Amino acid sequence: MTTRLDDTFARCRAEGRAALVTYVMAGDPDPETSLQVLRALPEAGADIVEFGLPFTDPMADGPAIQAAGLRALKAGQTVSGTLALVRRFRAENRTTPVILMGYYNPLYIYGVARFLADAVAAGVDGLIVVDLPPEEDDELCLPTQEAGLAFIRLATPTTDERRLPAVLANTSGFVYYVSITGITGSATPDFGQVEAAVARIRARTALPVVVGFGVKTGAHAAAIARGADGVVVGSALVDALARSLDLDGRATSGSVAAVSALVRDLAAGVRAAAR
């Protein structure tokens, strides 16, 4: 049986293009606005959505996503609240894959078995948990896959040939290549280096390889899309939402439209790079 992720990548391949993967923080700046943004992403051209789980110590995230997480936590966002938003989204959209991205601690506190059962029931398609290495696969990776969800692993510029097989061993859904060394949103990737890295990973796996970190514009997305199976954009979208908020950090009438406008530009870039 194919999954929503399988179907999405197959559709994009049939169209001769990469997938656009968009990241936003659940509950930013409040749960209802966050749900409106989530609904708007596929309407504006996103193929896959990543929904961030807010956490108090997000070590891999840059200032934009850290600030988004703090806004979400201030608004009362929780793991169960995030699953409730996915459930409401899934009641209207049965085709767009939803990946939850975050850190292990909130899931551990929630309870792994309970979380996985609730995630499946809500309509989640996979997880990206950035602080669990392959050596800890028994903790979450293997139970996630046994529950029928994808467990997506990160590869980085420092993942060498000795380490790569371990990274890929229990990865499913797709491989997420982090195009820069550092935190999210911190630099523009070296597109030549990215192309070589994608080729190196593809030689080791049949899974789609998507590239993220540092992608800010439609032109950046087009450059990555020419060589990868997918392009992830996160900090730029979180920034667009943040700039639309009022002085008290609350959503305005233009908040959802601000995110949608950038997604349309990114989608146009990805489609312009169709091969």
UniProtKB/Swiss-Prot annotation:
Instruction: Give the family from UniProt.
Output: Belongs to the TrpA family.
The catalytic activity of this protein is classed by the Enzyme Commission as 4.2.1.20
State the active site. E50 (proton acceptor), D61 (proton acceptor)
Tell me which UniProt keywords the record has, alphabetically: Amino-acid biosynthesis, Aromatic amino acid biosynthesis, Lyase, Tryptophan biosynthesis
Any matching Pfam family:
Trp_syntA
| Role | The alpha subunit is responsible for the aldol cleavage of indoleglycerol phosphate to indole and glyceraldehyde 3-phosphate.
Q: Identify the GO cellular component terms for this protein.
A: cytosol
Q: In which pathway does it act?
A: Amino-acid biosynthesis; L-tryptophan biosynthesis; L-tryptophan from chorismate: step 5/5
**Claim: Amino-acid biosynthesis is one of the keywords in the record:** yes
- CDD domains linked to this entry: Tryptophan_synthase_alpha
Please give the organism.
Answer: Methylobacterium sp. (strain 4-46)
Q: Which SUPFAM superfamilies match?
A: Ribulose-phoshate binding barrel
* Molecular function terms, GO-annotated: tryptophan synthase activity
- Protein name, entry field: Tryptophan synthase alpha chain
Under catalytic activity, the entry for this protein gives: (1S,2R)-1-C-(indol-3-yl)glycerol 3-phosphate + L-serine = D-glyceraldehyde 3-phosphate + L-tryptophan + H2O
Q: Which domain of life is it from?
A: Bacteria
Q: How does it assemble?
A: Tetramer of two alpha and two beta chains.
